[in-house]
């Protein structure tokens, strides 16, 4: 059986950049955000269950999920947010495990699970090791303000809604320092991969 590595970070620490580097190195990666979209596509049991609970008004004219509308509803209502998680989380988990199984059956030695809220969702048991993409909190704040065109207050609010990056780094098995150049980050990524995969 191959190894599964959980990849996580915080809101603007560069996890997507590292995720792309991993895939460019030829290592399979299963993205929790993509899985979350797949399990509520038109015609899925996930979407049917969401409609049964929230009503037809959360659908667009073409029968797909109106994410903006659903987002508005769950943002204001904790009970509804928990219900949505109850519907989607087990399906996302199954989707990711099935994808991993296919990679291992195809002979892959290493699979990454890209899970933004890995610690917050208590999904540590899904993976063998955890890698956190880290930057200083100052760099994280600066990048988020620039990337999303946010005020300092809005950016801080978004960062504070998640577990702090330093706490995530303490919980991790490995930390990739993405505070400097992309070249340095890539070197760390490739060194990490070589620990587990001999021919990469």
UniProtKB/Swiss-Prot annotation:
List, for all copies, the residue spans of the domain called DPCK: 4-200
Give Gene Ontology CC terms: cytoplasm
Protein name (record):
Dephospho-CoA kinase
Q: Give GO MF terms, alphabetically.
A: ATP binding; dephospho-CoA kinase activity
Give the protein's function: Catalyzes the phosphorylation of the 3'-hydroxyl group of dephosphocoenzyme A to form coenzyme A.
Which cell locations does it reside in? Cytoplasm
Among NCBIfam families, the record links this protein to:
dephospho-CoA kinase
Q: Which family does it belong to?
A: Belongs to the CoaE family.
Q: Pfam families of this UniProt entry?
A: CoaE
Please tell me where ATP binds in this chain. Answer: 12-17
What SUPFAM superfamilies does the database record attribute to this sequence?
P-loop containing nucleoside triphosphate hydrolases (SSF52540)
**HAMAP family in alphabetical order:** Dephospho_CoA_kinase (MF_00376)
- Which pathway does UniProt place it in? Cofactor biosynthesis; coenzyme A biosynthesis; CoA from (R)-pantothenate: step 5/5
Question: Per its UniProt record, what InterPro entries does this chain match?
Answer: Depp_CoAkinase, P-loop_NTPase
UniProt-listed GO biological process terms: coenzyme A biosynthetic process
Q: What is its EC number?
A: 2.7.1.24
- Supply the source organism for this entry: Listeria monocytogenes serotype 4b (strain F2365)
């Amino acid at each position: 059986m191959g190894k599964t590595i959980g990849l996580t970070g915080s809101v603007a620490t560069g996890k997507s950049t590292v995720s792309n580097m991993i895939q460019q190195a030829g290592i399979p990666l299963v993205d929790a955000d993509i899985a979350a979209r797949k399990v509520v596509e038109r015609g899925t049991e996930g979407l049917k269950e969401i409609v049964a609970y929230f009503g037809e008004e959360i659908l667009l004219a073409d029968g797909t999920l109106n994410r903006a509308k659903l987002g508005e509803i769950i943002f204001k209502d904790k009970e509804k947010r928990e219900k949505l998680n109850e519907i989607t989380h087990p399906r996302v988990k199954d989707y990711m495990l099935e994808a991993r199984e296919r990679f291992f059956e195809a002979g892959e030695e290493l699979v990454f699970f890209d899970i933004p809220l890995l610690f917050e969702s208590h999904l540590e048991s899904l993976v063998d090791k955890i890698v956190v993409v880290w930057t200083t909190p100052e760099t994280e704040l600066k990048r988020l303000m620039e990337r999303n065109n946010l005020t300092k207050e809005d950016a801080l609010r978004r960062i504070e809604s998640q577990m702090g990056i330093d706490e995530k780094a303490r919980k991790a098995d490995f930390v990739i320092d993405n505070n400097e150049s992309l070249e340095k980050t890539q070197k760390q990524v490739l060194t990490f991969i070589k620990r587990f995969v001999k021919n990469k």
